Design a protein with these regions (language model features):
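C-terminal scaffold of the Radical SAM
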Residues: 1-270
Length: 273
């Protein structure tokens, strides 16, 4: 049985009525679902239709990135409002949902220590139940023009991360490498840490079942065609050996900041000592 549901992949609230119907159907089909988490953007919180999700969503994760107007303009997120407007919309959201998580990013070009410090002070003033602070992640596939225009030199991130830890850990418990919560039992994270298996539904979703990782097609057209013909959306499958699975579990527990010797002994028959 499923106990938790995470609706991600961007602005999942763009069709509020469809999302509400989907959540209602999921809870009807799987009554064991007790926790529902949804991703959204700040401006949605100012939409009166957001009330359609009240009572259906337990955790609303809001992608803010920064409250600094200069950073928002550089990343083209000023379309979601000014830093002050974002602040006000999150304050409204906290009245509607049991848990509000604010997603922030550090490592932007031009994001000085002073700017990051102000962002963290703003967060502490809002006092959301959860805060997630991701480093800006650029890969070899990212266009060099994008890297040069928005990414800060990599060597500044360690100092910024230390500032985040120093400012947040007095009022928050660190839940994982990036996540902080008001208590140490918040139960929600973007990353699947506490479940050995998970099922992904929809275009671009990932599943880990048994010894295999499944990837659904990212093409909406192909996904609709596959589902319409009675097939599933899986386009790729990768089978892992026992050693690789153990490495994966170990890395997830390291990411969460806790390693359970009991888990590895009872579930996998492996003695970490």
């Amino acid at each position: 049985d499923f106990t938790s549901m995470y609706v991600g992949g961007g602005t999942t609230t763009v069709l509020m009525d469809e999302l509400a119907k989907t959540l209602e159907l999921a809870k009807k089909l799987f009554p064991s679902i007790k926790e529902v988490s949804v991703e959204t953007d700040p401006q949605i919180m100012g939409d009166p239709q957001i009330h359609m999700l009240e009572g259906l969503v337990d955790r609303m994760s809001i992608g803010v990135q920064s409250f600094d107007d200069g950073i928002l303009k550089m990343t083209e997120r000023d379309k979601f409002g000014t830093g002050q407007e974002v602040f006000e919309n999150i304050a409204k959201a906290q009245e509607l949902f049991p848990i509000c998580n604010v997603d922030m990013i550090f490592g932007f070009r031009g994001q000085t220590d002073e700017i990051l410090h102000r962002d963290l002070e703003t967060l502490l003033k809002l006092s959301p139940r959860q805060i997630t602070t991701y480093p800006l992640m650029v890969t070899s596939q990212t266009k060099r023009s994008v890297k040069d225009s928005i990414a800060a030199p990599h060597d500044i991130m360690a100092g910024q991360y230390r500032m985040i830890l120093d400012m947040l850990t007095e009022d928050y418990t660190q839940l994982s490498a990036w996540a902080f919560g008001k208590s140490n039992n918040e139960g929600f994270d973007e990353y699947v840490i506490d479940n050995d298996e998970y099922l992904g539904v929809g275009s671009g979703a990932f599943s880990f079942l048994g010894d295999s990782l499944y990837v659904n097609t990212f093409s909406l057209r192909r996904y609709n065609e596959r589902i319409g013909s009675g097939n599933n959306g899986v386009e790729r499958r990768k089978v892992f050996g026992k050693r690789s699975i153990l490495q994966y579990r170990l890395l997830l527990q390291l990411f969460a900041g806790r390693i359970s010797r009991k888990y590895f002994k009872e579930v996998h028959g492996v003695d970490l000592d």
